[in-house]
Design a protein with these regions (language model features):
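Sec-dependent N-terminal signal peptides
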Residues: 21-24
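Generic short beta-strand segments
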Residues: 59-65, 147-149, 190-200
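Acidic/polar, low-complexity intrinsically disordered N-terminal segments immediately downstream
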Residues: 4, 9-12, 32-113, 226
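Predominantly extracellular/secreted and cell-surface proteins with exposed
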Residues: 89-177
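Positively charged n-region of N-terminal signal peptides that target proteins for export
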Residues: 12-19
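Edge beta-strand at a domain terminus
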Residues: 38-41, 164-226
Length: 226
């Protein structure tokens, strides 16, 4: 009799254990099934989406800089312009970017003085569509490469390159694209100066912008509300 009860209790526990793990598996599968499903985009889809985002945009440059005193400050340049091309060029062009603001964070005084007098520049960044969801929402991002500059200081011309990086990615809503407002849900483009080079020589590194007492310059292009 005792053995029978013991066996019955064991069977009930075994059944409860199986039921628990069965329910847990079902919940996991249900959660996984609700996750977005991503897949690649066809050339035609990329072309259509590129046409949907192409155009001229107005916004504000917000340039945040740290001058090495652990005291980040910001400069705003309103009525700034940005152009996005279609799939043929697949580029984002930032217009009249004030590279002179970088002079605030350059350690070399001669270079800083030359930068302070530098005119605004246009520069381009390549963009890419990475994948899309079944509902038509697409992942998109841009990759700024570099800004070439020729500055005269220390009695000579210096051919410099401002290397840039960006970690901004967008989920472009199909509904926003159809409504003609592709960046309604995410309207900030971010990029940073990673370093200043002359040829292969690194003149100054800005990779540690968020570290205390480090020099750095981070730029946001905030689109105006449509």
């Amino acid at each position: 009799m005792v053995r029978l009860v013991s066996r019955t209790i064991f069977n009930e526990k075994d059944m409860m254990r199986k039921l628990f793990f069965g329910l847990l598996t079902a919940l996991i599968l249900a959660a996984c099934s609700s996750d977005p499903v991503y897949h690649g985009m066809t050339p035609q889809q990329k072309e259509d989406y590129s046409k949907a985002i192409a155009g001229k945009y107005t916004g504000t440059y917000i340039i945040i800089y740290n001058n090495g005193l652990n005291d980040a400050k910001a400069v705003k340049v309103e009525n700034s312009q940005m152009t996005i091309t279609d799939q043929t060029m697949h580029s984002v062009c930032f217009h009249n970017y004030p590279v002179s603001q970088l002079s605030r964070v350059v350690a070399d005084s001669a270079l800083a003085e030359a930068l302070a007098c530098a005119p605004n520049v246009d520069f381009q960044a390549d963009y890419h569509f990475y994948d899309m969801q079944d509902n038509g929402d697409a992942n998109w991002g841009f990759e700024p490469a570099a800004i070439p500059l020729t500055l005269h200081y220390d009695g000579a011309d210096h051919h410099l390159v401002l290397k840039l990086n960006s970690q901004t990615y967008f989920l472009l809503s199909k509904a926003s694209l159809d409504a003609g407002k592709p960046f309604a849900n995410q309207s900030v483009f971010q990029f940073a100066v990673a370093g200043i080079y002359e040829g292969n020589t690194l003149l100054q590194d800005f990779d540690d912008f968020w570290q205390d007492n480090e020099f750095g310059c981070l730029t946001y292009f905030q689109l105006n509300e449509e």
